[in-house]
Design a protein with these regions (language model features):
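N-terminal catalytic scaffold of extracellular/periplasmic and nuclease hydrolases
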Residues: 1-176
Length: 177
């Protein structure tokens, strides 16, 4: 589902080190052209240019020439291709019958790591949802929010989506701030 191209030294150089934190930073919809334009216009170096490990990826929807954020996010988070609007689900499961593909946040959680999804979007937006939920349609905010609360992810932080409330968060053992 995803092609990743390292742009700096390999992560293999760090295998013997005790790595405590990993941040998977996504500039949703951003390309190298946006970064270069920013550097040229402002005459600055970007902090992300100093990161020890960097990479890029090209994601493709299975059903459309243009990939939406749900299919792209699923490719990044689960390593599979799906249909546009599908969030962390298999292509041949439009009725949501089968087990879902595991996303990287769930994999880390299951390996006793602290996990979080932080976004400037709504918490149920397509890209953050791909790392924290599974839904047959990206616009099913209620289903996505419930799945996020059931996920046991340590932190979900973003803008209000009109679904999550303090009471709902408390019911699932979360603190709503």
């Amino acid at each position: 589902g995803t092609y990743i191209e390292p742009t700096t030294k390999s992560a293999d150089n760090y295998l013997d080190e005790n790595i405590e934190n990993v941040i998977f930073l996504i500039g949703d919809g951003m390309g190298y052209n946006h970064l270069e334009k920013t550097k040229l216009e402002r005459n600055i170096e970007l902090t992300l240019d100093t990161f020890a490990i960097q990479g890029s990826s090209r994601t493709r929807s299975l059903t459309n020439d243009v990939t939406d954020s749900a299919a792209g996010g699923t490719a990044l988070s689960c390593g599979i291709r799906t249909y546009n609007s599908g969030v962390g689900v298999y292509l041949l499961d439009p009725l949501d019958v089968f087990i879902h593909p595991v996303n990287i946040t769930e994999l880390c959680r299951d390996n006793k790591m602290l996990t979080g999804v932080i976004t400037t979007d709504e918490t149920s937006g397509a890209t953050p949802s791909a790392f924290s939920a599974h839904a047959t349609e990206r616009y099913k905010s209620e289903d996505i929010t419930e799945d996020q609360f059931n996920s046991n992810i340590n932190l979900i932080w973003g803008t209000e989506n009109g679904v999550a409330t303090k009471e709902m968060a408390a019911e699932y053992g979360y603190k709503y701030v």
